[in-house]
């Protein structure tokens, strides 16, 4: 862990919620018809119990960062199908004066040479998919820089739910049961997550006392127990016993990095993302391409609008898959991939009437998301994740620590910038988003869901900036998900005429009923005298506030 930085109380200015009006309509045209929350303080995430944990911190005098941390910690208990203590995390914070980015993703163990994997892909499960978990360092770093309440206070709701239990929600129960066949035989999984030999049912009480005890150790040591203490020793011992090469020295070497965000202008807004190794640049590339089309002249759910978005996303992913990696190993800087002339040239590759395969250009030389905002003007966009549901499936016995499988995103090909290597960060799917206008905060937002995430960022921004939809309608609207080549899946909420026309243009289109494949958006929009907070109906989520 890095030394505790100075808090930023001195350079924060008190912000009155002014100068930002709502540039959208107040219609809710989709079948969900969920309404936004309007309040001076707000927390949004995919689980109501977690949102209320954050709200409790605000009510006790904490700020939005305290609320975000408490929400994130509680999510490790009440939504274990998507994240845990062994997750990674990223965050963007508006402190009242400027943005701060935090990259708390972990690096590969020192023993992960290409030769260690024999030229084969990093597996998706087991200890050899686990990079150093970074979520704990994110909580500690965010609190050290911005927190107001005592660090241990932020853990209290999660510890209570771990010890006394919580009632499992229908969505979490469904995802839990669906993942059991994949993870049942991973070391430690059944003991932690199948105490009755099965996944819990909706409405059943689930207790996680080992998890609660671990959170108490983390709270008492500000995370040191996880990276250098008793918990680190347990992680190493479990790795040694199960064929992994992660060592206590890998955990001790971990650091979370404060970074400047990267950004792109879109229709008068500036969209901010965390720089690589994260894939936020995919959203910025796609939006930069769409800047060259008059999207506002096209109906929101028309084939013309959706086709252009799909084609822009394909081009953006082609570049990301070729060039994006740990930023210390990239041959190209993000600035070159976001060059306006380059994006203009990429836009010319789009055929308005036909789906085309996408190739990288040559520029010159399960996840949880949460957002919180307070009456002082502090806003937080934060995301943490195991990657594939329960991640690696590995759980360290007696600790409740379930471990992510972020190593699965490394490449095996020699010469690829994202090739697996010692102490290297892999390409990362989780991306918090933030929008400003003329240097002032407008919206903190995210769309969880693997490679859906940048696609969701693009679709939400197009709906708001081009089609004038309010953030709740932008969350509710039907979505597409590009898969590969010309393969696209769409929600059934699109008009039949749109789906038929997309097929006519050459998209290999499937429609699916499983809305969980299309991400889950949470967003907070800054109004003149408070916030508009929204939660996606595709999850159990809630916008809470006062």
Language model: regions and residue ranges:
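Noncatalytic scaffold domains of N-terminal-nucleophile
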Residues: 2-52, 56, 64-228, 232-278, ...
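Short, small/polar residue-rich loop motifs at catalytic or cofactor-binding pockets
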Residues: 258, 364-367, 428-430
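Short Pro/Gly-enriched beta-strand edge/turn motifs at strand-loop
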Residues: 71-76, 244-246, 350-358, 411-420, ...
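Extended C-terminal regions of large enzymes
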Residues: 273, 435-452
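Internal maturation/activation junctions in enzymes
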Residues: 20-21, 292-386, 399, 406, ...
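Active-site rim segments in enzyme catalytic domains, especially the processed small/beta chain
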Residues: 77-94, 98-101, 245-247, 378-443, ...
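Extended C-terminal subregions enriched in glycine
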Residues: 424, 457, 466-516
């Amino acid at each position: 862990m890095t030394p505790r930085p100075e808090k930023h109380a001195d350079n924060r200015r008190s912000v009155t919620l002014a100068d930002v009006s709502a540039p959208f309509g107040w219609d809710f045209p989709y079948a969900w018809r969920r309404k936004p929350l309007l309040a001076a303080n707000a927390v949004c995430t995919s689980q109501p119990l977690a949102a209320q944990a954050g709200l409790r911190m605000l009510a006790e005098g904490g700020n939005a960062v305290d609320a975000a941390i408490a929400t994130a910690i509680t999510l490790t208990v009440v939504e274990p199908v998507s994240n845990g203590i062994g997750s990674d995390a990223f965050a963007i914070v508006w402190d009242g004066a400027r943005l701060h980015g935090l990259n708390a993703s972990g690096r590969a163990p020192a023993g992960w040479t290409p030769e260690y994997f024999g030229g084969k892909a990093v597996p998706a499960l087991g200890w050899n998919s686990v990079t150093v978990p970074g979520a704990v360092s994110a909580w500690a770093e965010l609190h050290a820089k911005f927190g107001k309440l005592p660090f241990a206070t932020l853990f209290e709701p999660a510890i209570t739910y771990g010890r006394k239990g919580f009632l499992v929600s229908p969505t979490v129960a469904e995802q839990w049961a669906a993942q059991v066949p994949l993870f049942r035989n991973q070391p430690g999984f059944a003991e932690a997550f199948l105490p009755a030999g099965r996944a819990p049912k909706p409405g059943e009480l689930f207790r996680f006392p080992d998890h609660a005890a671990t959170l108490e150790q983390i709270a008492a040591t500000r995370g040191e127990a996880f990276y250098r203490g008793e918990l680190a020793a347990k992680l190493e011992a479990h790795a040694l016993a199960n064929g992994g090469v992660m060592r206590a020295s890998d955990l001790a070497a971990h650091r979370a990095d404060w970074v400047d965000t990267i950004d792109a202008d879109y229709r008068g807004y500036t969209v901010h993302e965390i720089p690589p190794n994260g894939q936020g640049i995919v959203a910025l590339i796609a939006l930069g391409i769409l800047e060259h089309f008059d999207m506002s002249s096209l109906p929101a759910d028309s084939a013309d609008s959706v086709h252009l978005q799909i084609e822009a996303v394909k081009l953006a992913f082609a570049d990301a898959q070729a060039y994006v990696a740990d930023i210390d190993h990239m041959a190209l800087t993000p600035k070159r991939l976001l060059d306006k002339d380059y994006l203009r040239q990429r836009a010319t590759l789009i055929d308005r009437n036909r789906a085309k395969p996408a190739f990288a250009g040559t520029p010159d030389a399960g996840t949880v998301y949460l957002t919180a905002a307070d009456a002082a003007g502090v806003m937080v966009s934060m995301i943490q994740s195991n990657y594939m549901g329960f991640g690696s499936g590995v759980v360290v016995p007696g600790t409740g620590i379930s471990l992510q499988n972020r190593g699965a995103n490394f490449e095996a090909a020699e010469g690829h910038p994202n090739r697996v290597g010692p102490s290297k960060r892999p390409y990362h799917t989780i991306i918090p988003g933030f929008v400003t206008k003329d240097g002032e905060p407008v919206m903190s937002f995210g769309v969880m869901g693997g490679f859906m995430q940048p696609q969701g960022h693009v679709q939400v921004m197009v709906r708001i900036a081009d089609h004038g939809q309010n953030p709740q309608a932008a969350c509710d609207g039907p979505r597409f998900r590009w898969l590969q080549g010309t393969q696209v899946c769409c929600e059934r909420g699109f008009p039949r005429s749109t789906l038929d026309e997309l097929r006519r243009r050459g998209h290999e289109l499937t429609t699916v009923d499983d809305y969980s494949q299309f991400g889950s958006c949470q967003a907070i929009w800054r109004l003149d005298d408070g916030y508009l907070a929204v939660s996606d109906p595709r999850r159990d989520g809630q916008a809470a506030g006062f």
